[in-house]
């Protein structure tokens, strides 16, 4: 259980530190190019992965509560699972998933209360006029953008000929990466330990 807690804590610390720095240092939509294929691009996400939204104001609250319930059930499952002997790698994978999920839940639950809007200005932490939204209605901060291939389709293609093409468009954060890496590790290396 210590490995899961430690991994989750480190991921959560890195995730929230970077998100708070981005939120209080960048305008919404601002970019900082590290390489042509690695860009820090500040965006906010109201809903699920890839900006998919669910049912407006009420849907946002339901989605955030659903995330909290799933993480709670996941933690109980992990607690029961750790009574059996499972490998250190599987524990680290679980820690990445839980830490990432908690990181995005923090944004969804509290960022609307503790930050003001980032549209026309850089957000302030704990602004005098209050935050941009209410409890459970915050936006998840995303910043990593990797346009690994930025080109055009060949002109001879019948449907997309000459259209602009970017491979790996999603903008994501450390929490998203932790969840993805943790799931990938389980499916690739540790699937039999969870059967």
Task: Describe the role of every protein-language-model region.
Residues 1-195:
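Alpha-helical transmembrane bundles and membrane-interface segments of multipass inner-membrane proteins
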């Amino acid at each position: 259980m210590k490995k899961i807690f430690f991994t989750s804590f480190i991921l959560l610390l890195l995730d929230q530190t970077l998100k708070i720095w981005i939120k209080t240092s960048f305008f919404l939509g601002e970019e900082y190019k590290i390489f042509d294929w690695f860009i820090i691009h500040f965006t906010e996400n109201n809903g699920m992965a890839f900006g998919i939204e669910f049912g407006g104001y009420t849907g946002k609250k339901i989605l955030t509560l659903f995330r909290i319930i799933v993480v709670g059930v996941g933690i109980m499952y992990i607690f029961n699972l750790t009574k059996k002997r499972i490998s250190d790698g599987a524990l680290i994978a679980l820690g990445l998933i839980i830490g990432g999920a908690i990181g995005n839940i923090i944004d969804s639950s509290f960022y609307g209360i503790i930050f003001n809007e980032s549209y026309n200005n850089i957000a302030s932490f704990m602004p005098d006029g209050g935050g941009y939204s209410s409890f459970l209605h915050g936006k998840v901060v995303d910043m990593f953008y990797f346009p690994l291939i930025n080109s055009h389709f060949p002109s001879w293609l019948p449907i997309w000929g000459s259209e602009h093409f970017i491979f790996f468009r999603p903008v994501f954060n450390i929490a998203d990466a932790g969840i993805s890496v943790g799931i990938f590790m389980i499916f690739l290396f540790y699937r039999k330990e969870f059967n």
